[in-house]
């Protein structure tokens, strides 16, 4: 029996409707964006088709509909969503199609190799992962972790200072994830911070010593 749920961190799942055998319509939760992240169980060996329905054409378009340039021959392929069997290693679906109809729909299908799978719009970066990263670097002598204040939902908005002189006048300021569609920029900034504090690059060390 196939089961859907959104009972985990970072999840977003609306109403699920079974249209036919191994064919499901997924309603997205109403919000100002288009975040999608849910779990499916009981899917090993089954080819399942998913129809994601959006509340507006704008949301469907933001999945990356391509413009063929020819209104008589539109290209309805779109940005492929991701799936993961462990919530850590992610893969694109082979194909996805978007249908600008009523309701606005993005459809994709896949034959799964494991019983449990996570499906999302793009690779997630969770708040608990952020806290784990900050905890790992907080005691490094070149790192200072502070809070700029709370977010609208009460979480800390962290700022990480890297260098021997936190009060230096000349600074480089990096911002990541200005909106919810940029979680991979968090990973890029993690890599940059790790490189800065690794102490394995003479040029980086010299730059930090000059700050």
What residue spans do the PLM features occupy?
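Structured catalytic-domain cores with a bias toward divalent-metal coordination
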Residues: 1-211
């Amino acid at each position: 029996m196939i089961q859907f749920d959104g009972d985990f961190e970072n999840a977003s799942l609306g109403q699920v409707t079974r249209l036919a055998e191994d064919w499901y319509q997924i309603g997205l939760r109403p919000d100002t964006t288009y975040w999608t992240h849910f779990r499916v169980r009981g899917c090993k060996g089954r080819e399942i088709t998913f129809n994601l329905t959006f509340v507006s054409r704008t949301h469907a378009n933001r999945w990356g509909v391509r413009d063929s340039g020819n209104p008589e021959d539109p290209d309805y392929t779109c940005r492929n969503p991701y799936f993961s069997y462990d919530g850590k290693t992610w893969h694109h679906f082979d194909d996805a199609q978007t249908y600008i109809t009523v309701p606005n729909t993005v459809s994709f299908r896949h034959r799964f190799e494991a019983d449990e799978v996570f499906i999302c719009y793009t690779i997630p970066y969770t708040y608990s992962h952020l806290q784990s990263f900050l905890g790992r670097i907080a005691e490094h002598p070149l790192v200072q972790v502070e809070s700029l204040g709370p977010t609208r939902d009460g979480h800390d908005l962290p700022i990480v200072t890297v260098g021997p002189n936190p009060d230096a006048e000349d600074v480089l300021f990096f911002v990541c994830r200005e909106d919810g569609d940029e979680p991979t920029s968090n990973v890029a900034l993690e890599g940059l911070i790790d490189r800065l504090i690794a102490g394995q690059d003479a040029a980086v060390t010299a730059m930090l010593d000059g700050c």
